[in-house]
A protein has these predicted regions:
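A short loop-to-beta-strand scaffold at the N-terminal edge of the catalytic core in hydrolase folds
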Residues: 10-19
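Active-site signature of alpha/beta-hydrolase-fold catalytic machinery across serine-
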Residues: 43, 113-117
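Alpha/beta-hydrolase
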Residues: 157-169
Length: 169
């Protein structure tokens, strides 16, 4: 896979990995988890290419604040993942034809939002470990958020503790 740069309509630069693009092949777009980047999933992408006999185009974007992307990131001011959804929407719209959207953790939620916002563009959705809450947990989170109580999520704390360097890479 080759590293490329996507420039948004506002001039922000996003780094992404892309396989050898074949016109007319299916498009698979992957969104990584918080604290990760596209490189993390290269083994998965290679297995997908083999499964589809190399007849699939794979795109994996480094989301803002991650990997080699230079787009402005303000993690302290982040209130939702909407900015990542907006970035993803513009990215998939730049790809010719329908896309299969996929992601891991936060990335799977972004993929799901894109599928719901763009049903004519997103043909399939594949989610790995989506961050989903049941109705009661969701209500508790919204109340705590509204009251500004315990704003730190355990899942975010766990993501913040992830290693940034892996000796084998």
């Amino acid at each position: 896979m080759e590293r490329k740069i996507y420039i948004t309509k506002t001039g922000e630069e996003f780094s992404y990995l892309a396989s050898d693009i074949k016109k007319g092949s299916r498009n698979f777009v992957f969104f990584h988890a918080t604290g990760f980047n596209a490189e993390t999933y290269k083994i998965l992408f290679n297995k997908i290419k083999i499964h589809f006999d190399n007849e699939i185009n794979i795109y994996a974007i480094d989301q803002r604040g991650h990997g080699m992307t230079n787009a402005k990131s303000e993690p302290d001011n982040l209130k939702s993942w909407d900015i990542f959804v907006d970035d993803g929407k513009e990215f998939i719209e730049s790809i010719e034809g329908e896309v299969i959207c996929s992601g891991h953790s936060m990335g799977s939620i972004i993929a799901a939002k894109l599928a719901s916002l763009n049903p004519s563009k997103v043909s399939h959705l594949f989610m790995i470990e989506p961050v989903l809450y049941g109705p009661l947990e969701s209500l508790k989170f919204r109340i705590k958020s509204f009251l500004r109580i315990n704003r730190e999520l355990m899942i975010a704390e766990g993501a913040a503790k992830r290693r940034s360097h892996f000796p084998s890479i």
